[in-house]
């Protein structure tokens, strides 16, 4: 509606520019806001999209006509034109703008995958430095390929879009409406991805990459997907931008542009779709409309108070400095941005806070229980497992067998190798030697997400929830490996996808109901707002959501008071009675005695005892390892 209310062509053009940067901010928001990958070279993909259309539509590039171009002429992508020197024919590229929007997005996504595949295993500052380098390389390549990009002079004569015979030319109004449509489309894509299985996987990686892998997310694949989709957004926007300007030069895509887009994302609200659009539009309006006027006011003030330097201030030329100041201020005083991505936690009513604890039934697990009742068949077999950290032997030839339907406790002093054992079983560490077989299949050296897919879920000694996701979303992430919706399904939202999501939400609520009104009333609360005990319960609920055949609990009652310990121990016992196979690390030996069918004792990375709790508690080696603390068994 803006062009109908305000017919100033320059202001409409500024509005189209603001929307173009909003589209770029939406793409970077997928990379930074959803997946948590710091990209300082995002303008490179903007350039790739721009040059893709520029090369395909500019009169400036006119290679000699040969038979090679004839198939493209049949497709109406090129035409044959008389050369300017009058000798021979040359190629005139005439690819449609509307065709190039998705094509440039695909080209940019391809380069995103090509660049990301070898680099996205890097993290933090290392990834930022590599992306910064890539962002600098692309303009350099454009400057040094004159036969394709016309070098430092840039491409001129880029064809304006046409629609139903109408040529956009330099009229700002049609570009504005195209920009509105483009931003609306990218917002819809962003929002649908965010609330889907794909978006939850990205946000899990952003919050805790290790926990995301352990709960079934293929981290490299999903980071690469985020990079590719973010690059596609930039590629499509680059095509629009160069079509509007009808020129493309390397200076349009330098490092300051990447920083400006990042500031827009931070300013609006990292991870919030509406927020980054608002942030981009506001900052572009500041740059286009207000800085020049503000400079004039400062000049007038300088003349009024006779201050010479105020009379020469040009704020527009200091836009990078201004954006840098905005970034610093936002990081210091409002990191969540103008429109935070996280929703405020709704306080529980007094009745909910003081209600008697009521738990759901464990019939939710009946499908698992029916399949994995206790048998004499080993579910997990660990043989000769050795893990070294330099000269330190963390695990030395450890053997362990876990029968289906049993509870096995692993105990030992601090530093005895218990958590290392769990980390190796679940793929977070690769053993130096030995084998791990689960349900008859070797799983040693497989990735954490593969181990989870096979049926082993775990909790961590130090709780690793996704703090910026709700309790319900944490449990839904736990179902990642058991759901099938990909990015295309998330975008189309077909009945099958909607049905799968509805069933997943229902299943998640049923799992939360296992912990009664400890968790169910808090389903919409951020995990970071929970008490310590409820964070423990939520982590177990998330592990159960993956429908595990084997559940590994690393010190589940650590940090809990006696009442909370008793309550959680009863719930673990209920899981066992429902047929769940459990291996737990536990220091509270009364919990071990009450729950475990078998106890394995580690000391300095070696197994020193194994057997029923009654037998192990009298073992002399165990008594020596615990320095008398075995009295806790009594």
Enumerate the predicted regions with their spans:
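The feature captures the beta-strand-to-loop junction immediately N-terminal to the Walker
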Residues: 411-413
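Conserved ABC transporter NBD signature motif
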Residues: 434-442, 454, 507, 513, ...
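Conserved catalytic motifs of ABC-family nucleotide-binding domains
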Residues: 547
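Catalytic Walker B motif of ABC-type/P-loop ATPase nucleotide-binding domains
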Residues: 551-555
């Amino acid at each position: 509606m803006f062009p109908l209310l305000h017919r100033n062509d320059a202001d409409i053009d500024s509005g189209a520019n603001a929307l173009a940067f909003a589209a770029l901010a939406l793409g970077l928001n997928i990379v930074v806001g959803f997946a948590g990958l710091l990209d300082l070279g995002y303008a490179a993909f903007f350039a790739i999209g721009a040059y893709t259309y520029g090369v395909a539509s500019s009169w400036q590039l006119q290679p000699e006509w040969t038979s090679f171009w004839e198939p493209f002429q049949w497709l109406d992508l090129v035409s044959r034109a008389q050369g300017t020197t009058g000798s021979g024919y040359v190629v005139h590229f005439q690819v449609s703008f509307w065709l190039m929007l998705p094509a440039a997005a695909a080209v940019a996504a391809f380069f995103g995958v090509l660049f990301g595949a070898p680099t996205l295993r890097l993290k933090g500052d290392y990834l930022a430095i590599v992306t910064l380098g890539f962002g600098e390389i692309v303009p350099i390549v454009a400057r040094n390929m004159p036969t394709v990009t016309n070098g430092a002079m840039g491409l001129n004569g880029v064809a304006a879009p046409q629609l139903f015979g109408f040529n956009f030319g330099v009229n700002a109004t049609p570009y504005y409406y195209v920009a509105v449509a483009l931003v609306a489309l990218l917002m819809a894509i962003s929002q649908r991805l965010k609330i889907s299985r794909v978006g939850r996987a990205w946000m899990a990686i952003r919050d805790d990459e290790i926990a995301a892998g352990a709960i079934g997310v293929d981290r490299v694949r999903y980071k690469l997907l985020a990079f590719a989709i973010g690059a596609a957004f930039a590629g499509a926007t680059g095509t629009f931008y160069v079509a509007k300007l009808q020129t493309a030069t390397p200076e349009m895509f330098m490092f300051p542009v990447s920083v400006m887009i990042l500031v827009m994302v931070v300013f609006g609200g990292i991870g919030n779709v509406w927020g980054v659009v608002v942030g981009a539009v506001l900052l572009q309006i500041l740059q286009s409309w207000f800085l020049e006027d503000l400079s004039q006011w400062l000049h007038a003030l300088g003349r009024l108070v006779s201050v010479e330097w105020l009379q020469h201030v040009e704020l527009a030329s200091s836009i990078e400095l201004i954006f840098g100041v905005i970034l610093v201020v936002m990081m210091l005083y409002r990191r969540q941005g103008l429109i935070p991505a996280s929703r405020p936690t709704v306080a529980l009513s007094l009745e909910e806070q003081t209600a008697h604890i009521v738990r759901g039934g464990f019939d939710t697990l009946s499908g698992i229980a029916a399949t994995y009742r206790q048998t004499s068949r080993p579910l997990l077999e660990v043989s000769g497992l050795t893990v070294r950290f330099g000269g330190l032997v963390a695990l030395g030839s450890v053997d362990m067998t876990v029968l289906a339907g049993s509870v096995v406790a692993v105990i030992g002093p601090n530093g005895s190798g218990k958590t290392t054992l769990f980390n190796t079983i679940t793929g977070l560490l690769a053993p130096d030697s030995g084998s791990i077989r689960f349900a008859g299949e070797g799983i040693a050296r497989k990735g954490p997400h593969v181990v989870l897919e096979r049926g082993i879920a775990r909790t961590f000694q130090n709780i690793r929830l996704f703090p910026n996701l709700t309790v319900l979303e944490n449990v839904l992430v736990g179902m990642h490996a058991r759901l099938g919706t990909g990015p295309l399904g998330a975008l189309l939202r077909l009945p099958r996808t909607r049905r799968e999501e509805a069933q997943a939400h229902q299943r998640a609520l049923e799992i939360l109901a296992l912990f009664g009104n400890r968790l169910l009333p808090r389903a919409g609360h951020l995990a970071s707002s929970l008490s310590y005990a409820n964070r423990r319960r939520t982590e177990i609920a998330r592990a159960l959501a993956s429908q595990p055949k084997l559940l590994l609990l690393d010190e589940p009652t650590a940090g809990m008071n006696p009442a909370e310990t008793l309550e959680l121990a009863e719930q673990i016992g209920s899981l066992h009675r429902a047929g769940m196979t459990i291996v737990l690390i536990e220091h509270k030996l009364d919990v071990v005695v009450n729950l475990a069918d078998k106890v394995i004792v580690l000391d300095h990375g070696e197994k020193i005892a194994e057997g029923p709790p009654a037998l192990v508690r009298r073992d002399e080696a165990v008594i020596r390892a615990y320095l008398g603390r075995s009295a806790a068994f009594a």
